[in-house]
Amino acid sequence: MIVIPRYTIIKEKASGRIPEILDNLNLKNPLVITGKNTKKYNKDFDFIYYDEIETSDLENIKNYAKDYDSIIGIGGGRPIDIGKLIAHKSKKPFLSVPTTASNDGIASPIVSLTQPSYMTEAPIAIIADIDIIKKSPKKLLSAGMGDIVSNITAVLDWELGKIEKSEKYSDSSGIFSKTIAIELMDYVLNSNLEEYPKKLVKALIGSGISIAIAHSSRPASGSEHLFSHALDTMKEKYDIDTTSLHGEQCGVGTLAIAQIYLEEGKLEVETFEMLKNSLKAVDAPVTAEQLGFDEEIIIEALSSANTLRKRHTILRNGISKEKAREILEKSEII
């Protein structure tokens, strides 16, 4: 069964409508999962800080919800992911109240606390207060663009899986995911960005819904996400001091993967330029240096990305470091 949000509110002062939405859903006693910086957006409900919750014990995490009829996640990625997980394990409805817009986790059924990610259910309601979101750090909002443009290469990878491995594919989910990305890119390339936070939130929610439709992360996560996960591995392996975000890494990864598709004749030059220029338009990174990684690290990440997850992508069985360097140079990432 496909579960998508019953209520989606994306507007100024939307957080003031949380009690109304709870009432509409006949929910009386929610538990709020939030952070110390976002606690101020919680009104009148019991809460717990996300970093006080032990997430490794998946079976007992449901006990946090035993005295409540619903879970609300207020904040960025981690409070919302933990809220989704508790709601899933306790079989209680989940409401997502994002305070920034850096990835599609605000609406998707995916929990990314571990690798591989964990499938739950999409939120029953999403309440996105634009007054709050537009005040979040610009770096987070530009990271959201990186997460959205990655839909283009993710869907190409999914289509490749269908062709080369007879993988199940959803036309409606794939088309929806690509259209969301194209519309946001078109907006940032042809406007003054005044409405960017609202447009971004709408796109991220749409991306999350495309995942719910497919019941898979495929429409929004492909080889560019494997590249991002590889960079995370490099950070730990070499103790790299960088503040690069998931969405930023996915954006750069999208350019690298798009270059491969370009060389195979499966992506137009105009599309590649649109991807790159839309990232630049919101000041998202497009080079290794802007991400905070040395050339050799980026090369190692791209050449090893295929090993991070058993998922068929354009990387197939992997590429050599020499080929990775060539791709990264041609796409001007290094």
From Swiss-Prot:
InterPro entries: G1P_dehydrogenase_arc, G1PDH, Glycerol_DH. Pfam families: Fe-ADH_2. Keywords: Cytoplasm, Lipid biosynthesis, Lipid metabolism, Metal-binding, NAD, NADP, Oxidoreductase, Phospholipid biosynthesis, Phospholipid metabolism, Zinc. Pathway: Membrane lipid metabolism; glycerophospholipid metabolism. Its main location: cytoplasm. It catalyses: sn-glycerol 1-phosphate + NAD(+) = dihydroxyacetone phosphate + NADH + H(+); sn-glycerol 1-phosphate + NADP(+) = dihydroxyacetone phosphate + NADPH + H(+). Its EC number is 1.1.1.261. Binds 1 zinc ion per subunit. Substrate binds at D104, D147, H229. One of its GO terms (cellular component) is cytoplasm. It comes from the Archaea. One of its GO terms (molecular function) is metal ion binding. One of its GO terms (biological process) is phospholipid biosynthetic process. It is found in: Cytoplasm. Zn(2+) binds at D147, H225, H246. NAD(+) binds at G77, R78, P79, I80, D81, T99, T100, A101, S102, S108. It is an enzyme of class 1 (oxidoreductase). Its cofactor is Zn(2+). Catalyzes the NAD(P)H-dependent reduction of dihydroxyacetonephosphate (DHAP or glycerone phosphate) to glycerol 1-phosphate (G1P). The G1P thus generated is used as the glycerophosphate backbone of phospholipids in the cellular membranes of Archaea. Belongs to the glycerol-1-phosphate dehydrogenase family. This is Glycerol-1-phosphate dehydrogenase [NAD(P)+]. It comes from Methanococcus maripaludis (strain C6 / ATCC BAA-1332).
